Amino acid sequence: MSEADQLKALRVRIDSLDERILDLISERARCAQEVARVKTASWPKAEEAVFYRPEREAWVLKHIMELNKGPLDNEEMARLFREIMSSCLALEQPLRVAYLGPEGTFSQAAALKHFGHSVISKPMAAIDEVFREVVAGAVNFGVVPVENSTEGAVNHTLDSFLEHDIVICGEVELRIHHHLLVGETTKTDRITRIYSHAQSLAQCRKWLDAHYPNVERVAVSSNADAAKRVKSEWNSAAIAGDMAAQLYGLSKLAEKIEDRPVNSTRFLIIGSQEVPPTGDDKTSIIVSMRNKPGALHELLMPFHSNGIDLTRIETRPSRSGKWTYVFFIDCMGHHQDPLIKNVLEKIGHEAVALKVLGSYPKAVL
């Protein structure tokens, strides 16, 4: 058989497979519509039916990855199913999601990675505004950055948890790649100013010192804002990601300029609904201890003695008084698990205040 005949036969087979895939996706979408009908009919009329279930989404994606036999890798297969699930959920109830804007930020990329591209995304000017939108019920969920592998905790987010009564419903980790972007009219040999968010400038400090040591570095509210500015300036460049480059029509003068090759940011999904256990969860808490010697040791001992893994601990000044502090702690497990429940009870007896921010599925993607 000639090469042309072989290719023709393969394309006919691919076309047939595409038709089968189309039929199955359509059947899945009709099932999603039926789920919406059943939930709406049985839900109390005074309340809005809940269609998005974080624990169910996490289980489906993990199940798909367990069943996958290749040649696509597990994450790529999960991303495909994430988009199918996002589209089907939009038939039931389009999700409204707030994130730290403007368009083109890593926060938007994190929102789309977690919820898929069928959500109604709403950019906000500040992290606190994302919290306020969720508390007010203007959106179903918010996406906020909480820590970076290079620069550490995002203090604006931690402080917002002290001010708002809100639930953590999930997490998403995003690999961060920074590029040096320029516009069509930029004279690349005459760049005198580089815009970016302060954290991004810090994450690319060594590269900038080596390649643009005498160029002014200007911190702005977001990388997307940096990209917008560069579009209209001939003597400036921006440090931002792929989404901002595509959105604002910029070219990459240099790619992946972050100082550390493994540079990622963790984002939290905030909302109002408690998430049931999945068997692979994290719990986030805020604790305020009495100001006395050994307070931190006393706080951590119940976790250690019960073999519970702590994945993060941060300290922030308390708003209640001078020289008092609160601890933000993430641990493995769900607050309904008997072991975690017992530890929290022990801590609660010694703490000035203890608040469970939420238990949620560990990031799948």
Curated annotation (Swiss-Prot):
Recorded GO CC terms: cytoplasm
Ranges for domain Prephenate dehydratase: 97-272
Keywords of this entry: Amino-acid biosynthesis, Aromatic amino acid biosynthesis, Cytoplasm, Isomerase, Lyase, Multifunctional enzyme, Phenylalanine biosynthesis
GO BP: chorismate metabolic process; L-phenylalanine biosynthetic process
Binding site for substrate: R11, R28, K39, E57
CDD domains: ACT_CM-PDT, PBP2_PDT_1
Localization (cell): Cytoplasm
Listed pathway(s): Amino-acid biosynthesis; L-phenylalanine biosynthesis; phenylpyruvate from prephenate: step 1/1; Metabolic intermediate biosynthesis; prephenate biosynthesis; prephenate from chorismate: step 1/1
Stored SMART domains: CM_2
EC number(s) stated in the UniProt entry for this protein: 5.4.99.5, 4.2.1.51
Pfam hit, one: PDT
Residue ranges occupied by any ACT domain in the UniProt entry: 284-361
Residue numbers marked as site, Essential for prephenate dehydratase activity: T265
Gene Ontology molecular function terms on file: chorismate mutase activity; prephenate dehydratase activity
Domain Chorismate mutase: 1-96
InterPro entries named among the record's database cross-references: ACT-like_dom_sf, ACT_dom, Chor_mutase/pphenate_deHydtase, Chorismate_II_sf, CM_dom_sf, CM_II_prokaryot, G/b/e-P-prot_chorismate_mutase, Preph_deHydtase
Coiled coil residues, start to end: none
Reactions performed catalytically: chorismate = prephenate; prephenate + H(+) = 3-phenylpyruvate + CO2 + H2O
Reported function: Catalyzes the Claisen rearrangement of chorismate to prephenate and the decarboxylation/dehydration of prephenate to phenylpyruvate.
Name this polypeptide is given: Bifunctional chorismate mutase/prephenate dehydratase
